[in-house]
């Protein structure tokens, strides 16, 4: 299913530069869009090309609402899908428009979003460090973010203050619900000169971090090359980049503060941090499964539910409970090992 994306659009109208039936030209735009993520173009330019790609990938020839996508007065566009036959487009506060789109078209748009936004930031060096941790968490499969947790993606490029002046705000926000309904978010922001990336669980107002691991941004800045910094005006305008990776355990809440001199091997730190987060997620998942098995056993037998061959059923569920318990202990051991290794590298963990 195509994830929902929302875009603040403050640019002028887009030219009708692509023949909708010409796959070569569409592929050319796809490649051009990919090339923008090399640290030399601003995110606003990338978003304009993304809109152009989506507009043409839908391939609707006679829909009168299509012109609204190119209207320079439009400031907000929401693109999503709830079924296999349509893509919905909401413009400002208007009722959403439904446009027919086949599965292949929608997969094209989804692929572009997945490959070129989730895994890209302005600064190539910084991107490689930050997202190596995210890839480690999801076993190298960035599609896990979309397919296993949520299908919601949101982009916000600019916001306006009371005087009408625009300024960068959330450059990229993906948010959604995990399988147990907790709010999870990945955020890249630029606020008051501080840029940061975060991955973690948020409380109900979707703003405050509920639990996780924090890394001081000054520790990362020094590892970004001068070439990468000079290539991006957005990066130069900021004094530091913060990267926050948050553990996903239901009972785990730690803050990791790094001073610059401690982060001698940033890639090793991020790799171990990624593994620790993944193992902690698996610990939480194993606890969930264990509790579920215990609940089944309690329901079937403590309440004397009438089942065929209750002794065999009880034995089966007890065996399953033992397996889940062993998996839980195994993941807890692996998680603790990664935390110990991180501590040996100079990472300080303080429970809060």
Swiss-Prot record:
Alphabetized, the UniProt keywords read: Secreted
User: What is one term from the GO cellular component aspect held by the record?
Assistant: extracellular region
Give the UniProt subcellular location, in the record's own words.
Answer: Secreted
Q: Which cysteines are joined by disulfide bonds?
A: none
Q: Which family does it belong to?
A: Belongs to the IcaT/YfdF family.
What function is annotated for this protein? Answer: May contribute to pathogenesis, although some of its characteristics suggest it is a fossil gene.
- Name assigned to this protein: Invasion chromosome antigen T
Give the species this sequence originates from: Shigella flexneri serotype 5a (strain M90T)
